[in-house]
Regions:
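N-terminal leader/targeting pre-sequences
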Residues: 1-136
Length: 136
């Protein structure tokens, strides 16, 4: 019997619209694939305080490289990089970091709220089988 191999991924989180929100969000997210489970851990600092954060990752289903959007993606020229404007370079919203990521239900109120210091921590084990079924 083959032993399950753990695979780790690391995402460096970079802020967008930092000059507008007047904070420099920072942290690294880790993703650990271990057998039938994906463990997601994200701890955020200096986010806008006391609000819910729709945290998720973006990507391309075909495996193309995703990039952090810049003001070049601000197609409506309002000075903000809006979520729909990110898709050309960052891909689509793939997996939400909410109360049930495997459900792939993006718009709802099940995301974390930052405390008064702009801190929050997300720690979740997600069944890979359920998550993979949403990508078929």
């Amino acid at each position: 019997m083959r032993e399950a191999v753990m695979v780790d991924y690391i995402a460096k989180i970079k802020p967008i619209n930092a000059d507008k929100i007047e904070t420099q969000v920072h942290r690294i997210a880790t993703f650990s694939e271990n057998g039938n489970s994906l463990h997601i851990h994200v701890e955020m600092f200096d986010t806008p305080a006391n609000i819910e954060h729709w945290e998720h990752f973006h990507g391309f289903p075909n495996g193309n490289q995703a990039h952090v959007p810049t003001l070049m993606q601000d197609v409506n020229h309002d000075g903000f990089i809006d979520l729909p404007e990110t898709e050309a370079v960052s891909g689509t919203t793939m997996v939400p970091f909410d109360d049930a990521p495997q459900e792939m239900n993006i718009p709802h109120d099940g995301y974390l709220v930052a405390d008064k210091y702009g801190h929050y921590e997300y720690d979740k084990d997600v069944p890979l089988k359920d998550l993979q079924a949403k990508f078929k």
